[in-house]
Design a protein with these regions (language model features):
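N-terminal export/membrane-targeting signals
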Residues: 1-7
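Aromatic-glycine hotspot motif
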Residues: 6, 13-106, 115-253
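Conserved H-X4-D acyltransferase segment
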Residues: 109
């Protein structure tokens, strides 16, 4: 019995997720998508994009049974930590095109999913974004844009009003919708840049502000093909913001 118990315990340790294991799995998925994106195999591009997308979104988005890095961070936030202050990113970068470099934890989720909503629906499919006045009220958001240009006091104030359960509902809606969009893409779309008028819709609909620390996003996105958007911001952008949360908070895996 002792040997059996030890064996079972050892197996649990071997299969238990750690931050390092999760980061390695995600890194491998990113590499697989990057390699596929260089080619013309449409189904492989979409599959690797969806695999990568699944790993950096809550498990409910893709229907996977195992918790993802997004689940671990969100679950921590949902236990009264939405206003924990964390770095905006974990690498050395010039933030002259940004507001505060320290933000409430909930800002990271707002920022990444507002951007995913705008890019996937308006730029990748010329459709209608999910966010509207009803979602704004449910989430308790004081803004409609991505929050790029918020100063520290503004970001702190923003975080205090956020309804975490409804923010999660918005995240799930955005993530599931993005997967449908990815499944419907053609190779021609993936290899093509989008019209300028689509890009300008984001400003017209309040997705960015006229502050240069916000509006520069339009220039950046306008230079990307749809395939490029599948990386930044649909997948890799999430890891850019989940990583500082994991590295600077006592989140258990």
């Amino acid at each position: 019995m002792l040997i059996s118990a030890c064996t079972t315990e050892d197996r649990k340790k071997e299969t238990a997720m750690t931050k390092e294991k999760i980061f390695k799995i995600i890194s491998d998925a990113e590499d697989a998508f990057g390699l596929a994106h260089q080619g013309d195999d449409l189904e492989k591009i979409k599959k690797t994009a969806l695999d990568f997308h699944a790993l950096v979104h809550p498990a409910e988005v893709s229907g996977t049974k195992e918790k993802t890095i997004a689940d671990f961070v969100f679950d921590y936030m949902a236990t009264g930590h939405q206003n924990d202050i964390v770095p905006r990113q974990d690498y050395d970068v010039d933030l002259k095109y940004a507001g505060t470099n320290a933000v409430p934890l909930c800002w990271h989720f707002w920022h990444t999913y507002r951007i995913e909503d705008l890019v996937s629906n308006i730029l990748m499919s010329n459709g209608k974004q999910i966010f509207n006045d009803e979602w704004k009220e449910k989430i308790g958001a004081s803004i409609t844009d991505t929050g790029n240009a918020l100063e520290y006091d503004e970001a702190v104030s923003f975080g205090k009003s956020i309804n975490v359960p409804n923010l999660r509902r918005y995240m799930i809606a955005v993530g599931k919708n993005t997967r449908e969009i990815i499944n419907g893409l053609t190779l021609e779309q993936i290899k093509t840049k989008v019209p300028e008028e689509w890009v300008m819709r984001i400003l017209e609909e309040g997705g960015v502000t006229v502050d240069f620390r916000s509006v520069w996003l339009l220039v950046f996105w306008g230079r990307l093909t749809v395939g490029g958007m599948l990386s930044i911001p649909i997948t890799d952008h999430h890891m850019m913001h989940l990583t500082p949360c994991v590295n600077n908070l006592p989140i258990e895996f």
